């Protein structure tokens, strides 16, 4: 790769006594796996810099699936996530690691990710709106296009007072039966704008993203959610990471 580009570390693990194997989310190449040789050595200039939520400029080389990190410079200090927001940030990182293919460019999603992490770092009253917006954005970039404003059965515009059932690969169908896949027209309008004025629309957004993300995640649970449940006190529903039910 020629030149520098912006990136964040999604995940890292030791590789030999002195090196790190990293998953990066880069602006121009999407998710890239790199080997940071010597990054764990005592005198390494990279020691402490290759951490999640630290904005980086990076360069790498290589043609295989695992590249060699040539240079990395922090643009600023790590964005200050702690407590609940830290676990939410780890959730977002794990989500990207699980669903993005290697070296597929998602430049717009990179900036949506940056906006999400910056919002979490500002310690909002609830992290849920930022998480729901990011999930919906990611689904859109992955090609999961859903029309929230029209009934898939009739083509008519969604009506606020009606109930609709979600069906994969089709959309929302008017229904008299309510269930886990049922949404009101008002909730669907909130999903279309990614604005959630109250707890009802926020819960509906969470329910929809759980349904939509399930095929991407399969049956394997997210480690970040398990960590949240183990190490943080129980919070109200609106304060939990995205895949908490």
UniProtKB/Swiss-Prot annotation:
InterPro entries the record matches: ARFGAP/RecO, DNA_rep/recomb_RecO_N, NA-bd_OB-fold, RecO, RecO_C
Recorded GO CC terms: bacterial nucleoid
GO biological process, one term: double-strand break repair
Transmembrane feature ranges: none
Annotated Gene3D superfamilies: Nucleic acid-binding proteins (2.40.50.140), Recombination protein O, C-terminal domain (1.20.1440.120)
Domain of life: Bacteria
Keywords from the UniProt entry: DNA damage, DNA recombination, DNA repair
Function comment: Involved in DNA repair and RecF pathway recombination.
Family named by the database record: Belongs to the RecO family.
PANTHER family xrefs: DNA REPAIR PROTEIN RECO
Protein name: DNA repair protein RecO
UniProt organism field: Erwinia tasmaniensis (strain DSM 17950 / CFBP 7177 / CIP 109463 / NCPPB 4357 / Et1/99)
